[in-house]
């Protein structure tokens, strides 16, 4: 019997049969009997196919877990860009735009930054930038006169500039480094000059003979001879002039000529309200050239009210004019009848305490006055009055642009 048992053991070893299976088939030399569950586990453990199945099950569980952990780590280390910063702080961006009297939309904000401003070919990156040079290049395209401009994009580029010039705490680390100051050219070293030779008689420079004056030598004449080479000397202020008979008033032409000589023309600064020292706003009125260019390069209000309304909207947003500047702008770009219609439509939109248009005359006169108010733009209250006034003026322009149908013209066509 022992020989049979040893033969069975050798056969079981050669064919990969475990001792547990030998016990199940009745081999007495296989040792003590075990339970069915212990036998099944031992068979699964020693079988190569069973080990492979267990490995695949463990791997199918671990691989998704590791993939999820790696993805979370990579997403946590995503590089922030100016565009992503503004989207993460969108509530602050909208509040900044609202304080300037404009509204911005998140979807259009992304479209302009990633597509339209990039296609302007002015160096604007898809991820956005807080560089004032890039913002200025985009502004030139947006504020281009006539059909080449983009008035609908004015609120967005204005908000970008506001974030760059007055950055909040989350923008400051992403501002471009300031440009190094341009070094001043070093003065050239003086070249050694030849020794001076003395002469008994100095050599006088040749002078051209004086030109005869075009105008008669009348000292009391207010006109100035513009053909002479040198301007006449102007008396300095050495004290009060002696009392005596007053000289006749100079003509307007002579006055303008003298003012041009005495006060050279300065460069035009078409920014009525600008920040000065200590963040205090300074006043710069419109120049005549600005008003002339706006009027000559745009159609009249009666011909294309939408285009002129968009122009005035961009001026109101970027220049932030005072009450006087708004009247000057309306007088330059609109006729008398058009101004009356715009002011009437604007006064209809004055909000009351409940936010709806009111009909109380005192509230209307206080919010949208027809006479010059006492609003100080250097104070927050004055700037708030001006902001609401500009919004109502823009609403009046849009209301006046909806002209009623001329029934006489319709009858002629029929």
Swiss-Prot record:
On modification after translation, the UniProt record reads: Glycosylated by host. Cleaved by host near the middle of the molecule, releasing the c-terminal half containing capsid and nucleoprotein domains op GAG.
Which residues carry a glycan?
134
According to its UniProt entry, one GO biological process term is: virion assembly
Q: Where are the transmembrane segments?
A: 52-72
InterPro entries, per this entry?
Answer: G_retro_matrix, G_retro_matrix_sf, Gag_p12, Gag_P30, Retrov_capsid_N, Retroviral_Gag-Pol_poly, Retrovr_matrix
Compositional bias ranges of the Pro residues kind: 174-193, 210-220
Membrane topology per record? Single-pass membrane protein
Q: Does this UniProt record's set of keywords contain Membrane?
A: yes
Q: Where is the composition biased (Low complexity)?
A: 194-206
Q: Which residues lie on this side of the membrane: Cytoplasmic?
A: 1-51
PANTHER family under this entry?
GAG_P30 DOMAIN-CONTAINING PROTEIN
- This one is known as Glyco-Gag protein
Q: Which organism is it from?
A: Feline sarcoma virus (strain Hardy-Zuckerman 4)
């Amino acid at each position: 019997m022992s020989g049979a048992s040893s033969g069975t053991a050798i056969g079981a070893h050669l064919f990969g049969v475990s001792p547990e299976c030998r016990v199940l088939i009745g081999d007495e030399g296989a040792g003590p009997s075990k339970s069915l569950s212990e036998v099944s586990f031992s068979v699964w453990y020693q079988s190569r196919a069973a080990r492979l199945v267990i490995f695949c099950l463990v791997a199918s569980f671990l691989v998704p877990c590791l993939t999820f952990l790696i993805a979370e780590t990579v997403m946590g280390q995503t590089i922030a860009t100016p565009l992503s910063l503004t989207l993460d702080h969108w509530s602050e961006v909208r509040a900044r735009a609202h304080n300037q009297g404009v509204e911005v939309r998140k979807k259009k904000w992304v479209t302009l930054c990633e597509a339209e401003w990039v296609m302007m070919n002015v160096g604007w990156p898809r991820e956005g930038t807080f560089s004032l040079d890039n913002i200025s290049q985009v502004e030139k395209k947006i504020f281009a006169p006539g059909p080449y401009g983009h008035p609908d994009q004015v609120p967005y580029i204005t908000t970008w500039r506001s974030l760059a010039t007055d950055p909040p705490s989350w923008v400051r680390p992403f501002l471009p480094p300031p440009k190094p100051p341009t070094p001043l050219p070093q003065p050239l070293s003086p070249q050694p000059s030849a020794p001076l030779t003395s002469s008994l008689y100095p050599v006088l420079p040749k002078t051209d003979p004086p030109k005869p004056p075009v105008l008669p030598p009348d000292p009391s004449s207010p006109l100035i001879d513009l053909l002479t080479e040198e301007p006449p000397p102007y008396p300095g202020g050495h004290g009060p002039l002696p009392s005596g008979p007053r000289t006749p008033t100079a003509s307007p032409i002579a006055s303008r000529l003298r003012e041009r000589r005495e006060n050279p023309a300065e460069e035009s600064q078409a920014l009525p309200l600008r920040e000065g020292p200590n963040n205090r706003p300074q006043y710069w009125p419109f120049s005549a050239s600005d008003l002339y260019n706006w009027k000559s390069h745009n159609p009249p209000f009666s011909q294309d009210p939408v285009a002129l309304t968009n122009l005035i909207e961009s001026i109101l947003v970027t220049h932030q004019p005072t009450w006087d500047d708004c009247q000057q702008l309306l007088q330059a770009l609109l006729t008398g009848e058009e101004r009356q219609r715009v002011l009437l439509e604007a006064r209809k939109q004055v909000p009351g305490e409940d936010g709806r248009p009111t009909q109380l005359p005192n509230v209307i006169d206080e919010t949208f006055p027809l006479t010059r108010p006492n609003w100080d733009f250097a104070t927050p209250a004055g700037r708030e009055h001006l902001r609401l006034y500009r919004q109502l003026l823009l609403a009046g322009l849009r209301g006046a642009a909806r002209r009623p149908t001329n029934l006489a013209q319709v009858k002629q066509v029929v």
